[in-house]
Amino acid sequence: MPKPGEYTPDTTEGITRVEDLPKPRIKRRTRNRRRRPCPRCGHNGYRLRSVHRTLHDLGDVISGRPCDVHIHYSQHRCPKCKIYFNAPMDDLALPKCHYTHRVVALAVRLVVEDGLPYRAASWHLWRDHRIFVPFGTVQNWVEAGGGI
């Protein structure tokens, strides 16, 4: 165990292969229901199929491992208005996004409040939170939010 003020190098420093990185800790969540109300008309839509989605969340600082959220959710079809819809996941992540709201908020905060460049913010997320976000993605999030 390191003493206070003692330098300890990053455990992932020098790793060049993705297979050698620490395996992520998995959190399992489910949004799989038989029926859901249709977002358009409110009629009960029946489950058509179950689908899987993986989101990357802030990692575990103590163990030094990344964290992934595996979500099993249901896709439904409304018999009344004939539309297809998914179980809502707006509280976890934006549609078609691979990262949770916590990751997006932290990345934008690093750039806007702390004034870090995009590349440094990306490195900070990996070093301190064990989540890899390409710096171009961080730039897209900041520009979409109107931060700079």
Language-model features: where?
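Short, conserved DNA-binding cores of transcription-related domains
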Residues: M1-D90
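Short, positively charged, Gly/Tyr-enriched micro-motifs
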Residues: V61-I148
